[in-house]
């Protein structure tokens, strides 16, 4: 199935921009959900409607009873579930690629600024932002906007996972019965319908359900881990910004100039010995 290969390539790209727990979540998604759905579930549910037999010859009765027992096929339901829980991850990948592109352009501007004279280059470096998400090794640092985006995508995954688990329970429960009783029109009376291989199908249902709960648990653990990490970084920044409240002398306060004023003096005023002496005094 080509759509699975495309989804696999996209999620493999996301893996390089995720936490360790996020990489484990992707492994669970690939091995315990997509792989089982591709190899086992398709074969087991290949005969679901053809082998759904009812003890009546009334035309249309079997189709109506099958629709009542299974409003949506299990395989298609799990397919929608995997697509839904993977979509927030793909949206996060789009944000990461946007940040990488923006900081790549920023690095190119800084490289052009480096060709200017040293004094002007010093002030321009202070005026522009420096890349803070991409490391020298090319990896992404999950912080700031990326951290918020990562947390949002985790919350969306958790909500979608819970909704699909609850939806599966209300649609057809977590086990399959051998016999289904149907009284829908156009069935002439109470009709007994029988399902093929209910035990084997119930085993796969429980397997996919356990995989969904493991995925939900990993998302909750990852969300807790990121919240603790963000709290520690916030406390560390507060300690770094804490300074001793010492009032500077009056002369130092009068002679203080902002970086913008110094830059304007360097640009507008011609170089002279008096200006040089003033700058040395500052």
Swiss-Prot record:
Q: Which GO terms describe its biological process?
A: cell-cell signaling
Where is this protein found?
Cell membrane; Cell junction, Gap junction
Q: Which InterPro entries match?
A: Connexin (IPR000500), Connexin_CCC (IPR019570), Connexin_CS (IPR017990), Connexin_N (IPR013092), Connexin_N_sf (IPR038359)
Q: What GO cellular-component annotations does this UniProt entry give?
A: connexin complex
Any Pfam family from its record, for instance, is: Connexin
**What tissue expression does the UniProt record report for this protein?**
Expressed equally in incompetent and competent ovaries.
Alphabetical UniProt keywords? Cell junction, Cell membrane, Gap junction, Membrane, Transmembrane, Transmembrane helix
Is the Membrane keyword given for this protein? Answer: yes
Q: How does it sit in the membrane?
A: Multi-pass membrane protein
Q: Example GO molecular function term?
A: gap junction channel activity
Q: Which residues lie on this side of the membrane: Extracellular?
A: 37-76, 172-203
The membrane-spanning stretches of this chain are 14-36, 77-99, 149-171, 204-226
Instruction: Give residue ranges on the Cytoplasmic side.
Output: 2-13, 100-148, 227-282
What is stated as this protein's family in its record?
A: Belongs to the connexin family. Alpha-type (group II) subfamily.
- Role summary: One gap junction consists of a cluster of closely packed pairs of transmembrane channels, the connexons, through which materials of low MW diffuse from one cell to a neighboring cell.
Share what the entry says about its subunit structure, partners included.
Answer: A connexon is composed of a hexamer of connexins.
Q: What is this protein called?
A: Gap junction Cx32.7 protein
Q: Which organism is this protein's natural source? A: Micropogonias undulatus
Taxonomy of the source species: Eukaryota, Metazoa, Chordata, Craniata, Vertebrata
């Amino acid at each position: 199935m080509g759509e699975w290969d495309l989804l696999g390539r996209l999620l493999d790209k996301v893996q390089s921009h995720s936490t360790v727990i996020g990489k484990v979540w992707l492994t669970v998604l690939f091995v315990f959900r997509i792989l089982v759905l591709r190899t086992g579930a398709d074969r087991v549910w290949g005969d679901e409607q053809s082998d759904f037999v009812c003890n009546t010859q009334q035309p249309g009765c079997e189709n109506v009873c099958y629709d009542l027992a299974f409003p949506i096929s299990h395989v298609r339901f799990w397919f929608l579930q995997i697509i839904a829980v993977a979509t927030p991850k793909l949206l996060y990948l789009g944000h990461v690629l946007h940040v990488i592109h923006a900081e790549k352009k920023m690095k190119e501007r800084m490289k052009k600024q480096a060709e200017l004279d040293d004094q002007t280059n010093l002030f321009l470096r202070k005026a522009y932002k420096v890349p803070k998400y991409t490391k020298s090794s090319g990896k992404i640092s999950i912080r700031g906007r990326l951290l918020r985006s990562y947390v949002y995508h985790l919350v969306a995954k958790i909500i979608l996972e819970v909704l699909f688990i609850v939806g599966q329970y209300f649609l057809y429960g977590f086990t399959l019965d051998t016999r289904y009783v149907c009284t829908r029109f156009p069935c002439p009376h109470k009709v007994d319908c029988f399902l093929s291989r209910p035990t084997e199908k119930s085993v796969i249902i429980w397997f996919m359900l356990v995989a969904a709960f493991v995925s939900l648990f990993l998302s909750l653990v990852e969300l807790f881990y990121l919240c603790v990490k963000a709290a520690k970084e916030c406390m560390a920044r507060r300690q770094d910004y804490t300074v001793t409240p010492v009032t500077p002398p009056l002369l130092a306060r009068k002679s203080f100039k902002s970086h913008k004023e110094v830059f304007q003096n360097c640009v507008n005023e011609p170089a002279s010995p008096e200006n040089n002496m003033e700058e040395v005094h500052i």
